[in-house]
Amino acid sequence: MANNKSAIELKNIVVDFGESVAIDNINLSVEKHQLVSLLGPSGCGKTTTLAVIAGLIKPTSGQVLFNGYDVTKKPPQERKLGLVFQNYALYPHMNVFENIVFPLYSDNSWKQAVLEKNSVANHEINCLLLTSNGASVQEIDQLNKLFHDSIEKPKQIQYQINDLNVSVFKNLNELTANLKLIPSKHQFAITNLNKQTLKQINELEAEFKTKWKLQKQTPIKSGVEHNAKLQAIKQHFSYEKQRLKKHYFKTKVELKQTLVENLKLVKKAISEQTKLIKQSSDYTKLKQLKRLIKVEPNQLKKQYKVFLNQLIKNYSLKTDKLTDTQLNEIEQIKTRIVSIKQFINKTALEVANKLAITKILTKRPDKISGGQQQRVAIARAIVRRPKLLLMDEPLSNLDAKLRVQTRQWIRQFQQELQITTVFVTHDQEEAMSISDVIVCMSTGKVQQIGTPSELYLKPANEFVARFLGTPEMNIIECSVKNNQLFWNNHLLVTESFKLNVEKLLVGFRYEQLVVTTNKSSLQAKLINIENLGKHLVATISLFDTTLSMRLELNSHLKVGDSLNFIIKANNLHFFDIDTKQRIEI
């Protein structure tokens, strides 16, 4: 069943802007109720990935699934999600309450859900009244079926339409996306050609000036010979410059021809694909369903109303035969019937109470603190009760202390509401403390997916190893001889390891380096000390390499001192020297 699927699934997502690939074939699943962090440096593609999930950016290729349903083509407002950005974007002319409720007034699907709840309550009351006035079990069952069909059948038809839209137009959509990319890729190629040609001309001019200057400075033995050499230099420069220009214009023409040919090929492929689609049985079924969705909801509602009116005519909706218990039950059901405005106020107050901002509801955004603004932004994002909450570096505008407090609060709040959350950050400490799962990214690719402890204790490659942990992991190149590790022909650790390579990268955390009095151990020079309050972080230099190590606060070492140290071998990490991937032993 679809509701057993992952909350979010990205399949082979590519975002190609022509001049650069922002996301390179990402596959990712986010399970229900998890808080998943997209972690990586600037430019790694994490915010673009979030934008694809939100529907703010259309992928060049690939699928976005929510609970098993394809939403790749759906706009953000139809994805039932909440968004919190780096800039909270609160409306300055509205107070906190008005900011929170604003999305509700502009969300037709949310209003429709409220009206549907009212319809359910009214239907339950009608069933109770009709039963008390003599309607049979079979008649009530038929009424329930007609009501259920009027609500659920249009939804099922829409789900079928969505699924068919994806399967029928998948190849065509990819071709159309490629067609849109061709001009930008052509422009990128022209830009590169311009840069390359300009660089070559500048280099040629620099070479010409150097040769001209040298010839000018050369002692003159013969004026004729001297002038001839100058003329030769000038002619060579003119010839080379002309050659570059010819090459430039020729390449430009070739690129233009390639553009025209590519456009022609893709347009032809689109035309052929369109013909195939129109001949397919799925396309015929899709057209039938689209016609059906226009009339079926009204027909189903009409059938329900006709049967309901017939039952009312036969049995009435009088309350004189109801017991006190039944009357109380009806009154209880009536409390669920509210106007749009009443429901908006009730929902907003519930959210404000959960986020502890009820005392500031009448204040404007400029009259509250940064932390409060952030909570208001979250309240506005979740007031529609979205299935997903997307947060793009929401803590970056807060000071260090408030950032720690707020991330703890977000985690607690997310666990209480059990809302599936995707959290973008470049701060590895933030991601480690708040996440169920971390997706570590670099250059548009997923480097590793796992729990915070999995990424920290077993990094999949050198990038993850360096990125997670403060200070970053020490990584050095070592050779392997007789199952022992050597760094610049010095024994690294006394322990042996079964490694089937001659060279590899060895990683170790700063706390694994320990000062020793053993003079035969590795010796380094202390070049920097940072006092972090609870301990010291020292930077040492050895074999033209800097390493980080931990020192206790009572250490008497100072910058410039030499020290001997050993490396604890119990948590060494090994990476392939070429692929940079983790080596398990």
From Swiss-Prot:
Keywords: ATP-binding, Nucleotide-binding, Transport. Disulfide bonds: none annotated. SMART domains: AAA. GO terms for molecular function: ATP binding; ATP hydrolysis activity. One of its GO terms (cellular component) is ATP-binding cassette (ABC) transporter complex, substrate-binding subunit-containing. PROSITE patterns: ABC_TRANSPORTER_1, ABC_TRANSPORTER_2. Residues 8-468 form the ABC transporter domain. ATP binds at G40, P41, S42, G43, C44, G45, K46, T47. Belongs to the ABC transporter superfamily. This is Putative ABC transporter ATP-binding protein MG187. It comes from Mycoplasma genitalium (strain ATCC 33530 / DSM 19775 / NCTC 10195 / G37) (Mycoplasmoides genitalium).
